[in-house]
């Protein structure tokens, strides 16, 4: 009788432990899927100092045009967007390693990057421009002769500057982790000019009136796209479908108007 009781106790204990194990396994699956009702979580790598595409507001919330676009696209895909601030210099490494699912933050489409990353169709135009202070003696690109110029490290600003004849005459080119640091050094006089995305400086010229000015001419005409890991055509297809739907239903236009005052999204 005692042996029977003990055997039954072991049987019950085994079932309980098995049930706990199953629940633990289910929990791991739900962590991978996350989101409401088991929807997938998409991890998006961003530069959180790249206004107005993705940056921190005065309450430290991550906001911006790309943030809103990515959030809406994830919803259209039945997923939730999780934003992961990354070192922009290592963005392709973060993507290829699987630590992020997408690069989405004013990410310029280039031939070099297309060898490493899958891209969506372009969704926004941009130019690489030269920026100085309003009272600077640098009035034209040719005036950069003998000057010190700042760029964001491993951004498309560097190659754009290198493609221009003035590159050989510039005294120093200083690289920065982000555009905020470069513009800060410009304001303090450690730089004579900064090369950066026109969409970025347009924002700062609005929020800091009377400080910066753009020189005439563009060093490079660019297009932004969303980067997807090579080999993940399935995710690329779903994302592009979501973006196309947003263009058709007016979501993209609404987000663009909120951030730029007009619909600038490419179709």
Where are these regions (language model features)?
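Acidic, polar ligand-binding/catalytic clefts
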Residues: 71, 80-143, 213, 218
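Extended ligand-binding regions for polar small-molecule ligands
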Residues: 21-23, 67-76, 142, 153-156, ...
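Periplasmic-binding protein-like
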Residues: 48, 125-132, 198, 202-243, ...
């Amino acid at each position: 009788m005692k042996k029977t009781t003990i055997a039954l106790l072991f049987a019950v204990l085994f079932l309980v432990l098995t049930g706990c194990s199953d629940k633990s396994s289910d929990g791991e699956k739900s962590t991978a899927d996350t989101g409401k009702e088991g929807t997938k979580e998409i991890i998006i790598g961003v530069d959180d100092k790249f206004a107005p595409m993705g940056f921190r507001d005065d309450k430290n919330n991550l906001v911006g045009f790309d943030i809103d676009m990515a959030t809406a696209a994830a919803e259209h895909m039945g997923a939730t967007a999780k934003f992961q601030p990354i070192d922009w210099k290592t963005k392709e490494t973060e993507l290829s390693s699987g630590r992020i699912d997408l690069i989405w933050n004013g990410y310029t489409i280039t031939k070099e990057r297309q060898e490493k990353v899958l891209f969506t169709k372009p969704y926004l135009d941009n130019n690489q421009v030269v920026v100085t202070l309003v009272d600077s003696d640098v009035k034209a690109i040719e005036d950069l002769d003998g000057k010190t110029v700042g760029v964001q490290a491993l951004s498309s600003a560097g190659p754009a500057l290198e493609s221009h004849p003035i590159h050989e005459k510039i005294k120093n080119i200083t690289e920065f982790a982000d555009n905020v640091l470069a513009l800060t050094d410009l304001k303090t006089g450690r730089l004579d000019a900064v090369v950066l995305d026109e969409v970025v400086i347009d924002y700062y010229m609005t929020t800091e009136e009377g400080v910066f000015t753009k020189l005439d001419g563009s060093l490079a005409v660019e297009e932004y796209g969303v980067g997807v890991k090579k080999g993940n055509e399935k995710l690329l297809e779903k994302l592009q479908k979501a973006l196309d739907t947003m263009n058709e239903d007016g979501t993209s236009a609404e987000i663009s108007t909120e951030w730029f005052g007009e619909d600038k999204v490419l179709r």
